[in-house]
Amino acid sequence: MDEKECVAELVDVLSQLSSNREEAMDRYERQVFTFIRNIKPETLDSLNLESELERIAAYPVILGALFMRKEFKKIDKIVNENLLSHLIGKKRVYDYFVGLIVKFLYLARKNECQDNSALFSLLVTNKELGNEYTVSVITNCLLDMLIGNKIFQRIDNSIVTTSEQARYNYYNGIIFMVEGDYESALKCFHTCVILSTNRDLVLGAEKRVILCMLLSSDYSIPYPCKPSLRIYFKLASAVKRADIKKFEETLESNKDELMSQGLYFVAKRLSQNVIQEGIRKISVVYSRISYEDIAHILGINSGEVEYLVKRTIRKGLIKGKVADGIFYSLREDKSKTDIGIGIRDCIQLANYIQEHMRYPAIEPLCYEKVRKVHDK
């Protein structure tokens, strides 16, 4: 096919995505590399694509064509300016397209000898959101990157000084955090805070502690609010209030700072916690509610609701069941019998503790007792 025929075919495939997605995706997957080889980036830029889905689907072709021309910096620029928010995989309908975008971004940055460590964070998020193709692409990219750098496993701890031990825990906390093991990450960051006398290192650990706690749905932040942690307390406030709009505003207005600290994509993961908190609040208020109503209340795509509700149930944040597009909240009501059993158990425990106390209870002094002891 010549360029004109390829463009006509691509436009037809893209327009079919909204009406007959299965057939359109089959055609796209079979022909995408043909489009890349035969269509110039300038031609693609001139296309008038109406929907966001069509535009996202066109980007892999644009990036692929640029990669063939070895315009690596331009690929990086396009992704950073237009596609960063999509790489986290929030919309699973974009899974295949995002996977291709990540592949070309990784290859471009690799050719420019640039850092690709953000892929660790993207891997965790896309795993959580069920983006199978993107996860497959990122996994292979990371394997390529690690093997290329001769990194095959974690480094054993053989550090003896306190200051270096603090830094070692800080670095290991970052590894655990990007992998999604927030419990282990918190242990490392807490250890770093305790051992370190370096103010910058402690501040970096505190920022990551807050993010890990929020990602674990734990809002008992152990630090006072101060200017250096302002962004993180704003994010915490948005998550607790389930305010997705405020969360996204805070994230985007502080994007440069978060990117410079390598925390933008980690903080971006909190979007799911915002929605989870919203679902939790809905489960308290409503005993029965449809997916469409949940989507309307939270301002999200109705197609994503079922997955998110089931995920929230699996995490144990809410109790309920789903059937035929309806969520039914299940509340645990304590019966009078349960309360009675609880009181009985408390009394038995108190008696047991008293019986096993090391020293007898001290009784108040009185004349009769003193006289009795004196007479003995």
Curated annotation (Swiss-Prot):
The keyword Chloroplast does not apply. It is found in: Cytoplasm; Nucleus. One of its GO terms (cellular component) is COP9 signalosome. Residues 159-336 form the PCI domain. The keyword Cytoplasm applies. Keywords: Cytoplasm, Nucleus, Proteasome. One of its GO terms (biological process) is ubiquitin-dependent protein catabolic process. Belongs to the proteasome subunit S3 family. The 26S proteasome consists of a 20S proteasome core and two 19S regulatory subunits. The 20S proteasome core is composed of 28 subunits that are arranged in four stacked rings, resulting in a barrel-shaped structure. The two end rings are each formed by seven alpha subunits, and the two central rings are each formed by seven beta subunits. The catalytic chamber with the active sites is on the inside of the barrel. Acts as a regulatory subunit of the 26S proteasome which degrades poly-ubiquitinated proteins in the cytoplasm and in the nucleus. It is essential for the regulated turnover of proteins and for the removal of misfolded proteins. The proteasome is a multicatalytic proteinase complex that is characterized by its ability to cleave peptides with Arg, Phe, Tyr, Leu, and Glu adjacent to the leaving group at neutral or slightly basic pH. This is 26S proteasome regulatory subunit RPN3. The lineage of its organism: Eukaryota, Fungi, Fungi incertae sedis, Microsporidia, Unikaryonidae.
